[in-house]
Design a protein with these regions (language model features):
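Core segments of cupin and vicinal oxygen chelate
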Residues: 8-51
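Vicinal oxygen chelate
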Residues: 5-12, 60-84, 87-125
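Eukaryotic scaffold repeat domains enriched in small/polar residues
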Residues: 54-55
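Short polar/acidic secondary-structure junctions
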Residues: 58-60, 98
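Short amphipathic alpha-helices in soluble, non-transmembrane regions
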Residues: 20-23, 81-86
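Alpha-helical elements of the RecA-like P-loop NTPase motor core of helicases
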Residues: 18-19, 79, 117
Protein backbone atom coordinates (compact mmCIF):
# COMPACT_ATOMS: atom_id res chain seq x y z
CA UNK A 1 0.00 0.00 0.00
CA UNK A 2 1.23 3.51 -0.77
CA UNK A 3 1.60 5.70 2.29
CA UNK A 4 2.47 9.04 0.70
CA UNK A 5 2.17 10.09 -2.92
CA UNK A 6 3.03 13.78 -2.90
CA UNK A 7 3.43 16.96 -0.92
CA UNK A 8 2.13 20.24 -2.33
CA UNK A 9 3.75 23.04 -0.35
CA UNK A 10 2.29 26.54 -0.69
CA UNK A 11 4.46 29.65 -0.74
CA UNK A 12 3.48 33.31 -1.20
CA UNK A 13 6.19 34.09 -3.80
CA UNK A 14 7.56 31.23 -5.89
CA UNK A 15 10.31 33.30 -7.53
CA UNK A 16 11.69 34.30 -4.14
CA UNK A 17 11.69 30.76 -2.70
CA UNK A 18 12.60 28.68 -5.80
CA UNK A 19 16.41 28.86 -5.32
CA UNK A 20 16.05 27.49 -1.77
CA UNK A 21 14.14 24.37 -2.88
CA UNK A 22 16.26 23.97 -6.03
CA UNK A 23 19.26 23.46 -3.71
CA UNK A 24 17.56 21.63 -0.81
CA UNK A 25 15.50 19.01 -2.61
CA UNK A 26 18.30 17.64 -4.87
CA UNK A 27 20.45 17.25 -1.74
CA UNK A 28 17.62 15.07 -0.37
CA UNK A 29 17.52 12.89 -3.50
CA UNK A 30 14.83 14.71 -5.51
CA UNK A 31 15.12 15.67 -9.18
CA UNK A 32 13.35 18.72 -10.57
CA UNK A 33 11.22 17.75 -13.54
CA UNK A 34 8.78 20.60 -14.07
CA UNK A 35 8.83 24.37 -13.81
CA UNK A 36 5.86 26.51 -14.81
CA UNK A 37 5.10 30.09 -13.75
CA UNK A 38 3.47 29.20 -10.42
CA UNK A 39 4.72 25.67 -9.69
CA UNK A 40 7.91 23.63 -9.27
CA UNK A 41 7.77 19.83 -9.21
CA UNK A 42 10.43 17.42 -7.96
CA UNK A 43 10.40 13.61 -7.79
CA UNK A 44 12.36 10.95 -5.93
CA UNK A 45 12.60 7.37 -7.09
CA UNK A 46 13.54 4.44 -4.94
CA UNK A 47 12.43 0.92 -4.08
CA UNK A 48 8.81 2.00 -3.72
CA UNK A 49 6.53 4.21 -5.78
CA UNK A 50 7.88 7.56 -6.94
CA UNK A 51 7.34 10.39 -4.46
CA UNK A 52 6.58 13.92 -5.62
CA UNK A 53 7.21 17.28 -3.93
CA UNK A 54 5.55 20.35 -5.42
CA UNK A 55 6.10 23.99 -4.50
CA UNK A 56 3.10 26.07 -5.53
CA UNK A 57 2.60 29.81 -5.45
CA UNK A 58 -0.40 30.92 -3.44
CA UNK A 59 -0.11 34.67 -2.83
CA UNK A 60 -2.26 34.60 0.33
CA UNK A 61 -0.52 31.63 1.98
CA UNK A 62 0.82 32.18 5.47
CA UNK A 63 3.05 29.57 7.14
CA UNK A 64 1.53 27.69 10.07
CA UNK A 65 2.66 25.15 12.65
CA UNK A 66 2.72 22.18 10.24
CA UNK A 67 6.14 20.61 9.69
CA UNK A 68 7.47 18.40 6.90
CA UNK A 69 10.26 16.00 7.91
CA UNK A 70 12.68 14.36 5.48
CA UNK A 71 14.55 11.12 6.15
CA UNK A 72 18.36 11.03 6.26
CA UNK A 73 20.37 7.81 5.94
CA UNK A 74 22.76 8.75 8.75
CA UNK A 75 23.64 11.25 11.45
CA UNK A 76 26.42 12.52 9.15
CA UNK A 77 23.89 13.23 6.41
CA UNK A 78 21.80 15.27 8.88
CA UNK A 79 24.93 17.26 9.74
CA UNK A 80 25.72 17.87 6.05
CA UNK A 81 22.17 18.99 5.33
CA UNK A 82 22.18 21.25 8.40
CA UNK A 83 25.18 23.07 6.94
CA UNK A 84 23.46 23.32 3.56
CA UNK A 85 20.20 24.77 4.89
CA UNK A 86 22.12 27.41 6.80
CA UNK A 87 24.07 28.27 3.64
CA UNK A 88 20.92 28.62 1.49
CA UNK A 89 18.98 30.85 3.85
CA UNK A 90 17.05 28.69 6.33
CA UNK A 91 15.65 30.48 9.37
CA UNK A 92 15.40 29.54 13.06
CA UNK A 93 17.69 26.55 12.86
CA UNK A 94 17.60 24.23 15.88
CA UNK A 95 20.13 21.43 16.01
CA UNK A 96 21.41 19.28 14.65
CA UNK A 97 21.16 17.18 17.74
CA UNK A 98 19.29 14.44 19.54
CA UNK A 99 15.62 15.16 20.13
CA UNK A 100 12.30 13.37 20.34
CA UNK A 101 13.76 10.36 22.15
CA UNK A 102 16.64 7.88 22.01
CA UNK A 103 18.37 7.62 18.65
CA UNK A 104 16.39 10.44 16.99
CA UNK A 105 18.85 12.94 15.49
CA UNK A 106 17.50 15.96 13.62
CA UNK A 107 17.82 19.53 12.46
CA UNK A 108 14.72 21.74 12.52
CA UNK A 109 14.45 24.87 10.37
CA UNK A 110 12.16 27.13 8.37
CA UNK A 111 12.39 27.97 4.70
CA UNK A 112 12.88 31.68 3.89
CA UNK A 113 9.11 32.34 4.10
CA UNK A 114 8.58 30.45 7.38
CA UNK A 115 7.38 26.96 6.37
CA UNK A 116 8.66 24.47 8.97
CA UNK A 117 10.91 21.64 7.85
CA UNK A 118 13.11 18.98 9.41
CA UNK A 119 15.74 16.45 8.38
CA UNK A 120 15.96 13.46 10.73
CA UNK A 121 17.67 10.13 11.23
CA UNK A 122 16.51 7.33 13.52
CA UNK A 123 19.27 5.04 14.74
CA UNK A 124 18.48 1.33 14.68
CA UNK A 125 17.32 0.03 18.06
Amino acid sequence: MRRLDHIDLRVPDLNAIAPFYQRLLPALGFTQDLTVPDWLQFYAEGDGPTEFFGVTESRHHRPNENRIAFWAESKDEVDQLARLVQEIGALNIEGPGYDEGPGYYAVFFEDPVGNRLEVCHRAAN
